[in-house]
């Protein structure tokens, strides 16, 4: 054996074996992101080397899955061994023969001489009489001589005098670890150094087999699990610490993390078990799966990014700490070091990175900057034999079932809290739902886990893939974190060549943290258990308090006051404020609804001020004259107070025009590329940016707290105790100019704004709510009733609603915006959602050629009767349940069964349009007249 063979064996052992992380994924409608690359489709992504122009996906497409166990080719026969070689001794059931020193002179058969040129030692199995190994001398010392077989599957020691064999070891698996060997009786495992002359760690077993596995241990609390065939490593780690519920394990060599759930007798691994034997995976994929940390770094001058994996690309150092370990990953080639702390708490494991501790040797334009990090991003990966699903909080929620056969579908990527809208797309993006909650769930047979991103969530994206996607047989879900974002721009109007620029300066997010909660359940777990665990996290850890005071459902209404419309004045086109729903009309709509039986109405009133109508920053709370002015507004308030109507004046300041002290030149968000962030309409035919309407400016987050303070004062002056902030409870974006506001900082500014408003005794309604808004809002409207519907999804579930029911009052998406309003009513009822309608008082023809022409469906005249009647239906079946949590939700075809904490069972039949509550049937037709929504 030559030195290069030893070097190669050591390198291979470092680059493969017992670890894992996750395979990210690309959401439909986005670029197909392979492995860990987080780049735009225009940016070349290298895999380990910056000069490669193809991304991982292209490389893997060309790389075939050729990973096979190494095999020894025995070319010499037992007869030739016994005839031409010198017998030594029998050791562990094998008789060994040594090559004579003068074999070239004494053997006349040239073919035999050629064979013996590469064979110094041969072993014949005493039981079968067959040659089982041939070996060459590798090294020697004063104690023994080391012999290795050509494929390094056999390791043999002889005494220094070459008189007898003293030890025989056989490799467990070259796919797992080329330095891990077993004794012939399978009682002992030994991990050798790369020179094979020293045992770094040894383990023993009593031979007991459980679930097809054999466990080896040692005095240092290490535990190695082999398949009962002794030819595959299932897992390897040492015990670190424990508490009453959980125990933490780590592999010092590979940084594999294990979390043992004592109650369930379940070990959760950061690496798919037996990953080295994935027959569908390429070497690159196995390395990816075998990495507990993955990183992307960017090179600004080269405008490129490069993937790095802890397996093969990083030196790993493990240090025990109180209740956990700190693992330092040193990516020498990139000049980057990333420390990660893994801490065992009472009922969860936390993985955490303090970005200030990350070391980058060169952060100049010619250096290497960390842009993305993924830690434990395939924790709890499921095999092709497992049964279960991932719970994905996309929109209302969705399930991705393990091994669903959707190999050709794009894997999933969802940006937590939505994508950063400052990076305005050249073409209209696909219409998708948003990830409102920074978490996901794993349900695997009798076990389940809730995973939540507790810090750095504003820069997280959730990825998931099923077996067969990305050339892996595993099902994987996890978080990736963008620590420096990028943007693309085009020079001189050339839209064919995009240039990439990275976010300047230090990483703006201080901490990245993910918690892994194994669930304690008496019965087989499902997604309602995951929802309960997340609800408990919100109330116990995230500062969310229950505000679901109404036991009966509400009727949520969005009124739209006015808009800008071009009219002809003396033949001259003039843009004028135009009423869509005057205050007097709003009162009449409410009265008509009340006359029809509607109760507990909650109104979100958009564009009710002059600033709101004109698109300026809306903070003065001054009623628009075109809607009836201050007197009519006060009359509407008085009516609402007297009739139990909750009125939320809405102010939506995401986009703006100059005025009211804020100007597009100074207060517009700046993109990473350095240009202003302008929001365009898109051409309906071609999907390209339209110039028909002037683009709107995106308001800088730097103004949020100041505006909140002014808004609070003005509302207090006008005795307004409620407000809606429109899209500013769902939209999250940074300002990358002189303000240097990251998404993480923008989230902090939004939370400070919510706090200022609520500290002023003003109640917030959220028109959709990201998780960070939940501690501040009283109730939520426009909660989606479906997911984005990606092909990889198997089923929509009302996960958001299950989390919120009994915690916050909420309504679903607008019934009258749906093409199937009856189904929307029934789905709302099935998910415990109050009903929601959009309405305007004027004819819908008034909307033509205005910014609100998308409200073509919202005629109050057309929908008042239907809204009142469907509310009566909703109240009949959901009365008394508003403060109860949902404990069960199951869909079987068109029948949905919802169970509440007080034992009430609501069965909704979508096809028959009948809802049964504890055995009593309620037919929708008995409440809602046919055609009542389109009589106008």
Residue ranges and their predicted role:
Residues 2-11:
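Bacterial N-terminal signal peptides that target proteins for export
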Residues 11-19:
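Bacterial N-terminal signal peptides
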Residues 67, 73-162, 167-547, 911, ...:
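N-terminal accessory beta-strand-rich subdomains and adjacent acidic, glycine-rich linkers
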Residues 600-602, 646-648, 721-724, 763-765:
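Structural preference for beta-strand elements that scaffold enzyme active sites
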């Amino acid at each position: 054996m030559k030195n290069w063979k030893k070097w190669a064996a050591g390198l291979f052992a470092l680059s493969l074996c017992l670890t894992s992380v996750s395979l990210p994924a690309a959401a439909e409608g986005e670029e197909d992101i392979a492995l860990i690359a987080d780049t735009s489709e225009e940016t070349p992504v290298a895999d380990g080397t910056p000069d490669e122009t193809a991304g991982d996906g292209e490389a893997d497409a060309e790389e075939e899955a050729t990973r096979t166990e190494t095999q020894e080719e025995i070319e010499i026969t037992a007869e030739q061994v016994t005839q031409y070689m010198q017998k030594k001794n029998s050791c562990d059931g094998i008789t060994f023969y040594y090559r004579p020193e003068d074999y070239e002179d004494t053997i006349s058969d040239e073919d035999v001489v050629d064979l013996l040129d590469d064979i110094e030692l041969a072993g014949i199995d005493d039981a079968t009489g067959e040659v089982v190994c041939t070996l060459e001398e590798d090294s020697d010392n004063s104690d023994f001589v080391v012999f290795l077989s050509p494929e390094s599957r056999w390791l043999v020691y002889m005494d220094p005098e070459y008189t007898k064999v003293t030890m025989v070891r056989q490799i467990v698996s070259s796919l797992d670890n080329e330095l891990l060997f077993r004794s012939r009786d399978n009682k002992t495992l030994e991990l050798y150094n790369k020179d094979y002359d020293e045992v770094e760690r040894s383990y023993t077993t009593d031979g007991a087999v459980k679930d097809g596995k054999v466990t080896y241990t040692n005095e240092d609390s290490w535990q190695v699990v082999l398949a009962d065939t002794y030819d595959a490593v299932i897992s390897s780690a040492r015990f670190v610490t424990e508490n009453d519920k959980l125990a933490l394990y780590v592999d010092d060599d590979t940084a594999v993390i294990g979390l043992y759930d004592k109650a369930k007798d379940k070990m959760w691994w950061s690496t798919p078990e037996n990953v080295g034997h994935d027959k569908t995976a390429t070497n690159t994929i196995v390395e990816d799966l075998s990495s507990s940390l993955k990183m992307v770094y960017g090179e600004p001058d080269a405008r490129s990014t490069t993937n790095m994996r802890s397996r093969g690309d990083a030196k790993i150092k493990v240090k025990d700490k109180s209740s956990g370990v700190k693992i330092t990953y040193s990516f020498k080639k990139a000049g980057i070091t990333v420390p990660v702390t893994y801490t065992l708490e009472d009922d969860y494991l936390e993985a955490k990175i303090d970005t200030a501790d990350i070391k980058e040797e060169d952060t100049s334009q010619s250096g290497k900057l960390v842009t993305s990090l993924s830690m434990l991003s395939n924790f709890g990966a499921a095999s092709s034999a497992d049964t279960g699903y991932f719970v994905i909080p996309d929109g209302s929620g969705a399930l991705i079932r393990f091994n669903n056969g959707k190999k050709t579908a794009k894997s999933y990527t969802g940006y937590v809290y939505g994508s950063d809208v400052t990076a305005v797309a050249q073409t209209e993006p696909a219409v998708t739902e948003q990830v409102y909650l920074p978490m996901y769930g794993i349900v695997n047979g009798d076990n389940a886990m809730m995973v939540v991103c507790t810090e750095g969530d504003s820069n997280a994206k959730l990825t998931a893939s099923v077996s067969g996607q990305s050339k892996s047989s595993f099902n994987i879900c996890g978080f990736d974190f963008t620590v420096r974002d990028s943007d693309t721009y085009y020079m001189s109007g050339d839209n064919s060549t995009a240039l990439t620029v990275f976010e300047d300066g230090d990483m703006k997010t201080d901490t990245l943290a993910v918690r892994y909660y194994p669930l304690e359940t008496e019965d087989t777990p499902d997604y309602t258990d995951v929802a309960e665990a997340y609800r408990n996290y919100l109330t116990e850890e995230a500062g969310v308090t229950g505000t679901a005071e109404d036991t009966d459902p509400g009727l949520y209404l969005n009124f739209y006051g006015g808009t800008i419309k071009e009219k002809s004045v003396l033949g001259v086109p003039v843009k004028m404020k135009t009423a869509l729903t005057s205050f007097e009309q709003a009162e009449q709509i409410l009265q008509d609804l009340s006359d029809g039986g509607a109760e507990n109405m909650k109104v979100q009133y958009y564009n009710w001020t002059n600033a709101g109508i004109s698109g300026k920053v809306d903070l003065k709370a001054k009623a628009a004259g075109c809607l009836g002015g201050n007197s009519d507004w006060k009359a509407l308030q008085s009516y609402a107070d007297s009739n139990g109507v909750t009125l939320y004046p809405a102010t939506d300041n995401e986009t703006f025009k100059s005025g009211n002290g804020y100007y597009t030149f100074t207060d517009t968000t700046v993109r990473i590329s350095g240009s202003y962030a302008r929001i365009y309409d898109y051409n309906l035919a071609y999907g390209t940016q339209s110039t028909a309407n002037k683009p709107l400016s995106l308001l800088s987050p730097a103004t949020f707290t100041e505006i909140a303070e002014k808004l609070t004062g003005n509302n207090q002056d006008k005795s307004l105790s409620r407000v809606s902030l429109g899209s500013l409870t769902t939209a999250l974006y940074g300002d990358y100019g002189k303000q240097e506001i990251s998404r993480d900082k923008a989230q902090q500014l939004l939370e400070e704004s919510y706090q200022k408003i609520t500290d002023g005794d003003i109640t917030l309604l959220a028109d959709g709510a990201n998780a960070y808004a939940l501690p501040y809002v009283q109730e939520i409207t426009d909660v989606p009733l479906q997911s984005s519907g990606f092909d990889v999804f198997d089923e929509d579930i009302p996960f958001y609603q299950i989390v919120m029911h009994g915690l916050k009052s909420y309504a679903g998406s607008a019934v009258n915006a749906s093409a199937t309003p009856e189904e929307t009513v029934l789905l709302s009822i099935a998910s415990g959602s109050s009903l929601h309608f959009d309405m305007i008082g004027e004819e819908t023809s008034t909307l033509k050629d205005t910014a609100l022409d998308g409200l073509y469906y919202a005629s109050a005249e057309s929908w008042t009767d239907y809204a009142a009647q469907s509310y009566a239906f909703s109240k009949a079946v959901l009365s008394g349940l508003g403060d109860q949590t949902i404990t069960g939700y199951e869909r079987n075809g068109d029948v949905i069964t919802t169970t509440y904490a007080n034992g009430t069972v609501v069965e909704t039949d979508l096809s028959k349009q009948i809802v049964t509550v504890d055995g009593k049937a309620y037919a929708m037709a008995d409440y809602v007249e046919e055609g009542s929504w389109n009589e106008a």
